[in-house]
Amino acid sequence: MRVLGIETSCDETGIAIYDDEKGLLANQLYSQVKLHADYGGVVPELASRDHVRKTVPLIQAALKESGLTAKEIDAVAYTAGPGLVGALLVGATVGRSLAFAWNVPAIPVHHMEGHLLAPMLEDNPPEFPFVALLVSGGHTQLISVTGIGQYALLGESIDDAAGEAFDKTAKLLGLDYPGGPMLSKMAAQGTAGRFVFPRPMTDRPGLDFSFSGLKTFAANTIRSNGDDEQTRADIARAFEDAVVDTLMIKCKRALDQTGFKRLVMAGGVSANRTLRAKLAEMMQKRRGEVFYARPEFCTDNGAMIAYAGMVRFKAGATADLGVSVLPRWPLAELPAA
């Protein structure tokens, strides 16, 4: 069984083909980073127009990479939400149209379920149950996962997502968009302890996050100190350490609350090396396991949509003839498979 996956929720056009026996057969990705760099962030209208230009050529490239023809595709999965409405509509329209033309089922996929299941693409996939840390530019959530579609929200950010805080703080430090990875690279040259940032909402019970205050603290620290390269690196180090520590503390609480021994980390920020190292160290001390996808599957991609579509297809999920998307779509609303 082979599923074509289409991802267009934001500023990456991702197309992949997944085979339930052979695994990933094709993976094509186009990033719009250069398109949005001059604006310091994603411009929704530009993102949608670029998806229109890139989606079909990437599908053709994926078919060529896999050596398959359209007749050998058994279903088409597409990201139906959450995300930018215009961008979502491009992928949904193309996906639904191809499914109709090829006479195969169309499978709407939840973007964050795609991220959550991305570690399943690895050679050592996690088993249920586990705590999932979904951490990206748009989401920071802790989820109790006991099966496909069996998701319970434990905590989430009440304001900025961790990835958004990374990008905004990077901009304050004079780094280009997207600044998160650049900030981490700068932080590696920083001196630990020169600046000490707060660990938001760790001084009280609960599993919710807040990162807007941390961004403000960073802005004040930047204004109050010199603009030399080492000072900027030290501030980046203090900021990254604060975010990583906060995420780690909340993960520890979630594991204590659920009693689970496995932690899954997914989303763009899960590619952060410092975060990976800290969580791996924490889970080793707890005699548990931590799982995450390879870096290219942490950010938005078609492979996770193709895989999640395969899982949902086997569970009987299909879409009607209409084209509909959900820019806001709580993960907990998904049905169990």
Swiss-Prot record:
SUPFAM superfamilies, A to Z: Actin-like ATPase domain
Sorted UniProt keywords: Acyltransferase, Cytoplasm, Iron, Metal-binding, Transferase, tRNA processing
Residues binding Fe cation: 111, 115, 300
InterPro entries on file: ATPase_NBD, Gcp-like_dom, KAE1/TsaD, Peptidase_M22_CS, TsaD
One GO process term, biological-process aspect: tRNA threonylcarbamoyladenosine modification
Catalysed reaction equations from the record: L-threonylcarbamoyladenylate + adenosine(37) in tRNA = N(6)-L-threonylcarbamoyladenosine(37) in tRNA + AMP + H(+)
Localisation per UniProt entry: Cytoplasm
CC annotations in GO: cytoplasm
Major subcellular location class: cytoplasm
Domain of life: Bacteria
Gene3D superfamilies in alphabetical order: 3.30.420.40
Pfam families linked: TsaD (PF00814)
Statement: the UniProt record of this protein carries the keyword ATP-binding: no
GO MF terms, alphabetically ordered: iron ion binding; N(6)-L-threonylcarbamoyladenine synthase activity
Swiss-Prot/TrEMBL cofactor(s): Fe(2+)
Cofactor binding: number and manner: Binds 1 Fe(2+) ion per subunit.
Binding site for substrate: 134-138, 167, 180, 272
Entry EC number(s): 2.3.1.234
Family: Belongs to the KAE1 / TsaD family.
PANTHER family in UniProt: TRNA N6-ADENOSINE THREONYLCARBAMOYLTRANSFERASE, TRNA N6-ADENOSINE THREONYLCARBAMOYLTRANSFERASE, MITOCHONDRIAL
Functional note: Required for the formation of a threonylcarbamoyl group on adenosine at position 37 (t(6)A37) in tRNAs that read codons beginning with adenine. Is involved in the transfer of the threonylcarbamoyl moiety of threonylcarbamoyl-AMP (TC-AMP) to the N6 group of A37, together with TsaE and TsaB. TsaD likely plays a direct catalytic role in this reaction.
Protein name (record): tRNA N6-adenosine threonylcarbamoyltransferase
Organism: Citrobacter koseri (strain ATCC BAA-895 / CDC 4225-83 / SGSC4696)
Gene that produces this protein: tsaD
